[in-house]
A protein has these predicted regions:
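Helix-loop-helix hairpin linking two adjacent transmembrane segments in secondary transporters
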Residues: 106, 143-190
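Intracellular juxtamembrane helix-capping segments at the cytosolic ends
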Residues: 120-132, 322-335
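Helix-to-loop junctions at the C-terminal end of transmembrane segments
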Residues: 68-79, 268-281, 365
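Conserved MFS/SLC helix-loop-helix module at the cytosolic interface between two early adjacent transmembrane helices
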Residues: 66-104
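Cytoplasmic helix-loop-helix junction between adjacent transmembrane helices
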Residues: 111-147
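C-terminal transmembrane helical hairpin of 12-TM major facilitator-type secondary transporters
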Residues: 282-327
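Structural signature of the two symmetry-related core transmembrane helices
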Residues: 82-96, 283-298, 378
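Juxtamembrane intracellular "pre-TM" segments in multi-pass secondary transporters
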Residues: 3-12, 191-222
Length: 397
């Protein structure tokens, strides 16, 4: 998008258009989470170990992170509509090819490709912020994040349902077709933006390093967000291990249904956007960190009481999603003309937390069981608290 678009007065976005963008965010981001409830189904289908199937979850986050680092920065340089649609088409074909995986190499390769292209949501969010009037920008980010969160939530339920009644391959094939159809819709509805001729590809990537070096506030918010996402990723990756084993013995579909608890994230994203817009950033931060920290108490009893487990999941999900919206609004204020690049730096670090959380879940479960997972959540939450409080003190100076 050109600088002119970012700096001139723009009319309020229509509710239908915001809904369209939010749906696109959910569709794209959700595909990176299909394999979380499918670990045991993939293991059985391909004849591989649980840890090998679980590593596909880690690779999904790595692929998404690579896309964030390499492609999202181009949102400040290229025509955003072309970039978004191209990424959706690439992701769609990768998902279709993933559905034909017959060995571990194909599973891993096309998992990375599919999630590499799924980052179009991360181009769309700063785009929506840039074309919004300043007074509604925070609320728009919250609504788009609500769509993204809903996509992630429903993706697990969709994957569990299709896998239980058809196969895990059908999950990716059907999603690929839907994504292709939606890419066509996005091409007709999204506004076209001119390429920024003042930027070059090399200059864009250099500016990422410059942002990382000169904006410690950005790095601190990203690191705090990454640890929060590590908590959530750990909770949802280990959910299959907890619920598919005694005493619950849930199916893929039942695990996906349990994941619907994450619907709380829709309300927390919207609430956070509105509350931050009123200037209550510190209140949001303290509440969110408290929820993530104290979620360890009910999560400790996950294998004994399903209600306690549900409460812990709700607390961690609300805390992380609201905290993420807070962080995005804080870092977008750094430079309105570089929001795609700022988002790239923030989200690359943020999604490294997802990979860390997934990897920690697999490793901790293998070596220490559920108690190892809960201890890891507590460590991550303490890290968030320390980084967040230090950042707020630095910003007050």
């Amino acid at each position: 998008m050109s600088n002119a678009v970012a700096t001139t007065t723009t009319p309020a976005l229509s509710p239908k258009f915001v809904l369209l963008m939010a749906t696109a965010c959910g569709l794209c981001a959700g595909s990176a989470y299909f394999n979380q409830p499918l670990i045991y189904s993939i293991e059985k289908s391909l004849g591989i170990s649980t840890s090998q199937a679980g590593f596909a979850v880690v690779l999904a986050q790595i692929g998404y992170g690579l896309g964030l680092m390499l492609l999202v920065p181009l949102g400040d340089l290229l025509n955003k509509r072309k970039l978004i649609v191209s990424l959706m088409v690439f992701a769609a074909f990768s998902q279709i090819l993933l559905s034909f995986s017959s060995n571990l190499a194909m599973l891993y390769f096309f998992t990375v490709c599919a999630t590499f292209g799924a980052i179009s949501a991360q181009v769309l969010i700063p785009f929506g912020s840039s074309i919004s009037p300043p007074e509604s920008s925070a609320a728009i980010v919250g609504k788009l994040m609500s769509g993204l969160v809903m996509g992630i939530i429903l993706s697990r339920t969709f994957a569990g349902f299709v896998s239980t009644y058809w196969s895990w391959q059908a999950v990716y094939f059907s999603s690929g077709i839907i994504t292709l159809l939606f890419a066509g819709l996005m091409w007709t509805k999204l506004p076209s933006t001119a390429a920024n001729k003042n930027l070059t590809v090399a200059g864009t990537y250099r500016s990422l390093i410059q942002l990382a070096v000169t904006q410690p506030h950005l790095i601190r918010r990203a690191c705090a967000g990454a640890l929060g996402f590590a908590i959530l990723s750990l909770v949802f990756t280990s959910m299959t291990f907890v619920l598919a084993n005694p005493p619950y013995y849930f199916s893929d579909f039942q695990i996906g249904l349990f994941g619907l608890l994450g619907v709380i994230g829709i309300f927390s994203s919207s609430w956070s956007g509105k509350t931050v817009g009123k200037g209550r950033e510190n209140f949001v931060a303290i509440l969110c960190i408290g929820l993530m920290l104290f979620s360890c108490i009910p999560l400790f009893f996950a294998q004994q009481n399903i209600v306690a487990y549900a409460v812990g999941v709700l607390m961690s999900y609300f805390g992380l999603t609201a905290f993420h919206v807070l962080n995005q609004n804080l870092v977008y204020r750094i430079d309105a003309t570089a929001r795609s690049r700022i988002n790239a730096v923030y989200m690359t670090i943020y999604f490294s937390g997802a990979a860390l959380g997934s990897l920690t879940a697999v490793y901790a479960w293998q070596h220490w069981g559920w108690m190892g997972c809960v201890a890891s959540i507590l460590i991550f939450a303490v890290g968030i608290l320390l980084i967040d409080r230090y950042d707020f003190r630095q910003q007050e100076r």
